[in-house]
Curated annotation (Swiss-Prot):
GO terms for cellular component: cytosol. Substrate binds at residues 245-250, 309-313, 379-384. The active site is at D247, E284. This is Malto-oligosyltrehalose trehalohydrolase. It comes from Mycobacterium tuberculosis (strain ATCC 25618 / H37Rv). NCBIfam families: trehalose_TreZ (TIGR02402). Residues 56-88 are annotated as: Disordered. It is found in: Cytoplasm. Residues 60-69 have a biased composition (Basic and acidic residues). InterPro entries: DUF3459, Glyco_hydro_13_cat_dom, Glycoside_hydrolase_SF, Ig-like_fold, Ig_E-set, Trehalose_TreZ, Trehalose_TreZ_E-set_sf. Its EC number is 3.2.1.141.
Length: 580
């Protein structure tokens, strides 16, 4: 018979409801309640706290077939009490140096399910992708959302296909030698369906922009930390994910001697040894703090890699000319060159946006560039714009190609956001489907007020609750094979193939990277061994003082003995001639 266990130190009485039958539970001194009850494999169950007749879902629920406010359903990972997995031959691979593809299951396809996404995996293989990174798939209130307001971290969002759908998706990825990363949000809980405070002290007094913080350093926080780490390991052990992207780790306020991220990294290394395959943790952080990716033996946390917004900002502003908000300190080619060579632009320097010093220098002799992720756009960089407009909606094809070349041609681990490889015309706007009218109204009003401060008219801001906002974010796959979209797609595919096949592009050390530029003529050259990535960021043709064998180009460069003429907004990748 299955055992039911729940950590609930707060209530004086906890009872188990299985398919409507109520059972007593026994409390241990550590706040765990437990009982053993005969229950079908698909039983619906939940917990009754004190004298409240409301049946609450299991905080560690594996499945919520009727949403986050309803009863949980028993579910066991395949291979334990059900059918065997089909990916047992998958050896795994490290994420360092890979090409990652970030996608949102709900908008990646028309159907918005794991099974529909499986049908696009061969396309990703042909593109040259190494890892798929799923935006959060944990359960959240409503049917539509980015997933970052999850409240039942252990369960899989049912409209996507639930836990069985995720198993099928990961097996299908592994059959094609694609790794899978899952975006995990441990810094806050969503505003709808969060019953954890009824069970125990899961929340802290420390708040962040998204809500109450998580109690990872206060009284009774040991079990909360276990809750986080067990959840993280479960994605990799039970679902066979190859790693996690950890959302906004700077919002994890931990004053203990061993940070929860270091504890998680240690547990992940242990699980990797048990499973016999590599597992990766990628931290999203805005602190430019290399201690995250420094080995524990050298005083770091031992996280595999981290997102790097400085590289995005440096490339985006140099190409687009945008300088608003946190772009204020970026924009020049000098800034671009410095950031590409050093990993961070702000490394203890003054940030005008933050109005203080920011960041810490990266030891480029000890930490390879593959520990940092470079990208031209992400769900954040697109979705946090007022209209959710992609770079493809305001830049030329040549400008998009330049951004891609500087990113994929760099020594950093690279990441694409779904559809960028063909210049998708669909936006990626903020959307949600809160079932509570008051919460829905406050979310819509808050979005409009936020952008009104930046000069946007309220009527211009998409309504996140409107189903059409969600619908317009779905990729239009038909355009990927037509016209300029197809041309950009071919360029991306050729560029990724070059990255995979050229030994010089696999060199992870920034000390070997050279970047030349001319601020007035608007050209930049990134040198990777014998390869030179020459880009004209200007609106007029220009001559770049490099020459060699043409490897790949956007537009048609004129290559001379000592220089190359580039058309406006174009690039050429050249191979230097071998010394005579």
């Amino acid at each position: 018979m299955p055992e039911f266990r729940v950590w609930a130190p707060k209530p004086a009485l906890v009872r188990l409801d299985v398919n409507g039958a109520v059972h007593a539970m026994t409390r241990s001194a550590d706040g765990w309640w437990h009982t053993t009850v005969a229950a079908p494999a698909d039983a619906r169950y939940g917990y009754l706290l004190d004298d409240d007749p409301t049946v609450l879902p299991d905080p560690r629920s594996a499945r919520q077939p009727d949403g986050v406010h309803a009863r949980s359903q028993r579910w066991e990972p395949p291979g334990q009490f059900g059918a065997a997995r089909t990916d047992t031959g998958w050896p795994g691979r490290s994420v360092e140096g890979a090409v990652i593809y970030e996608l949102h299951i709900g908008t990646f396809t028309t159907a918005g399910t794991f099974d529909a996404a499986i049908e696009k995996l061969d396309y990703l293989v042909d593109l040259g992708i190494d890892f798929v990174e799923l935006m959060p798939v944990n359960s959240f209130a409503g049917t539509r959302g980015w997933g970052y307001d999850g409240v039942l971290w252990y369960s899989v969002h049912e409209p996507y296909g639930g836990p069985d759908g995720l198993v099928r998706f990961i097996d299908a990825c592994h059959a094609r030698r694609l790794g899978v990363l899952i975006d995990a949000v441990f810094n806050h809980l969503g505003p709808s369906g969060n019953y954890l405070p009824r069970f125990g002290p899961y929340l802290s007094s420390a708040s962040n922009p998204w809500g109450d913080g998580i109690n990872i350093a206060g009284a009774d926080s040991d079990e909360v930390r276990h809750y986080i780490i067990d959840c993280a390991l479960r994605w990799m052990r039970d679902f066979h994910a190859d790693g996690l992207r950890l959302d906004a780790v700077h919002a994890l306020v931990d004053t203990t001697a061993v940070h929860v991220l270091e504890e998680l990294a240690n547990a992940t290394r242990w699980l990797s040894g048990q499973l016999g395959r590599p597992l990766s943790l990628i931290a999203e952080t805005d602190r430019n703090d290399p201690r995250l990716i420094t080995r524990p033996s050298h005083g770091g946390y031992g996280i595999t890699a981290q997102w790097n917004d400085d590289i995005h900002h440096a490339i985006h502003t140099a190409v687009s000319g945008e300088r608003q908000g946190y772009y204020a300190d970026f924009g020049s080619l000098a800034t671009l060159a410095y950031t590409l060579r050093n990993g961070y632009f702000h490394a203890g320097t003054y940030s005008s946006f933050r109005r203080r010093r920011h960041g810490r220098a990266l030891d480029t002799s000890a930490i390879p560039a593959t520990r940092l992720l470079a990208y031209t756009c992400t769900h954040d960089q697109v979705g946090n714009r007022a209209l959710g407009d992609r770079p493809s909606q305001y830049l030329t094809g040549g400008q998009l190609a330049i951004k891609a070349a500087l990113t994929l041609g760099s020594p950093y681990t690279a990441m694409l956001f779904m559809g960028e490889e063909w210049g998708a015309s669909s936006p990626f706007q903020f959307f949600c489907s809160h079932p509570e009218p008051e919460l829905a109204h406050s979310t819509v009003a808050g979005r409009k007020e936020e952008f009104a401060e930046h000069g946007w008219a309220a009527d211009d801001i998409p309504d996140p609750q409107d189903p059409q906002t969600f619908q317009r974010c779905k990729l239009n796959w038909a355009e990927a094979g037509s016209g300029e979209h197809a041309r950009l797609h071919r360029f991306y595919r050729d560029l990724i193939a070059l990255r995979h096949n050229e030994a010089d592009l696999a060199d992870p050390w920034l000390d070997h990277l050279m970047v030349d530029y001319d601020e007035q003529q608007r050209w930049v050259v990134m040198r990777r061994g014998q390869l030179m990535i020459a880009c004209n960021l200007g609106a007029e043709p220009t001559c770049v003082p490099v020459s060699g064998e043409l490897v790949l180009a956007w537009e048609s460069p004129i290559i001379g003995d000592n220089s190359t003429e580039l058309a406006a907004y174009s690039l050429a990748i050249l191979r230097a001639a071998e010394p005579a």
